[in-house]
Amino acid sequence: MTRLIFLGPPGAGKGTQAQILAEHLHIPHISTGDILRQAMKEQTPLGIKAQSYVDSGELVPDQLVQDLVEERLEQADAKSGWILDGFPRKVTQAAFLEELLQKTGQGGERVVNLDAADDVVVARLLSRGRKDDTEEVIRRRLEIYRSDTAPLIDYYSDRQKLLTINGDQSQEEVTHELKATLGS
């Protein structure tokens, strides 16, 4: 049973690789951004709460994101495995997830760190041509990633769950290395 958590800086290719691998393994690619948007669109109780934060320009609180992730991992299609993308972002969320997976008998997860150099990530994100992706904004997002999310690398490394993949490679090379490393 495959349970993977994808980490890496913005522009490292997490979403792309998670989707490719999820299709290859026939398991759901669970993106926290997607489940948040879906819950708001469907006006679920959690979605209504989240919408109030989004409408007021605030970050959705950790507890609400954790509740959404828990709800999603309890769905039938996630019982045979999953790939999480965009969660956890902090060590406190990782501890929550670890406890949740133990409680639900879904342990054995592995963590894929798509490690990409800042200059590579900046070039990739600038090439997307989004007007809000200026070099200054991208470098700020990288700073936030390094300070908030990077401690997860140590957290999972200490638990011998971390696989690091060179995210500087082409999409095809990363996919090949991922499949080879995971034996899929």
Swiss-Prot record:
It catalyses: AMP + ATP = 2 ADP. Keywords: ATP-binding, Cytoplasm, Kinase, Nucleotide biosynthesis, Nucleotide-binding, Transferase. Its EC number is 2.7.4.3. It holds the Pfam family ADK. Residues 127-133 are annotated as: LID. Its main location: cytoplasm. Residues 31-60 are annotated as: NMP. This is Adenylate kinase 1. It comes from Nostoc sp. (strain PCC 7120 / SAG 25.82 / UTEX 2576).
